[in-house]
């Protein structure tokens, strides 16, 4: 199923920006699935278990209570200023047949507390087309691979993957690419883009993940 749509003339085309590569993918909400696991799993595991043909890394956290990803979900809900959120109402689990649709809340504010899954990240990059203030520190000034989730309408989400970009440079860049809302996800060595059963962007040593976004 071809779910990738052209956003602008550069959509799904590698673009050189200071020797970096970047990709923008538009995905209809109805075609998006979130997969959560018990603990950390390799990309190959997701591919084999769920017949994944497209995926990207997702959240810093999931709603599990395991190892380094023990969170946080309940704590974050009580302290909503700690992280920006995307609230996702349904998701796919490895041991159930849950509904696979998601709802993208484009205000990126406090999530629906009835949500079954919440994807978190930091910082918030754009909100309603407005560039958000980003503190200048080692994290935001470092040029690293990054993954961003966002949107420009209510019918689709946008995924942005860059091989090297500073977070402080994201607001202007993402506005140029047509984003209205955007949030930085886990990135750096976790940045991954797998499309049409091909690793489009990956690290030399693949990491394992608590959850992925697939379509």
Can you annotate each of these PLM segments?
Residues 8-215:
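Gly/Ser/Thr/Pro-rich low-complexity, intrinsically disordered segments
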């Amino acid at each position: 199923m071809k779910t990738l749509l052209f956003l602008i003339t550069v959509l799904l085309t590698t673009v050189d920006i200071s020797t970096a590569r970047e990709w923008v993918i538009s995905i209809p909400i109805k075609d998006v699935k979130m997969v959560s696991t018990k603990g950390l799993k390799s990309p190959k595991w997701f591919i084999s278990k769920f017949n994944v043909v497209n995926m990207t890394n997702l959240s810093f956290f999931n709603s599990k209570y395991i190892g380094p990803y023990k969170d946080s979900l309940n704590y974050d809900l009580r302290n909503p200023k700690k992280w920006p959120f995307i609230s996702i109402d349904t998701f796919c689990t490895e041991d159930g047949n849950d509904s696979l649709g998601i709802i993208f809340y484009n205000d990126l504010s406090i999530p629906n507390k009835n949500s079954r899954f919440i994807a978190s990240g930091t910082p918030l990059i754009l909100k309603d087309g407005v560039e958000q203030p980003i503190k200048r520190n080692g994290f935001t000034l470092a040029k690293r691979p990054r993954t961003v989730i966002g949107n420009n309408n209510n019918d689709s989400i946008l995924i942005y993957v860059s091989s090297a970009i500073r977070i402080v440079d994201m607001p202007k860049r993402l506005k140029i690419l047509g984003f209205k809302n955007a949030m930085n996800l886990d990135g750096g060595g976790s940045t991954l883009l797998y499309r049409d059963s091909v690793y489009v962007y990956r690290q030399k040593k693949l990491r394992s993940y608590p959850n992925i976004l697939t379509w």
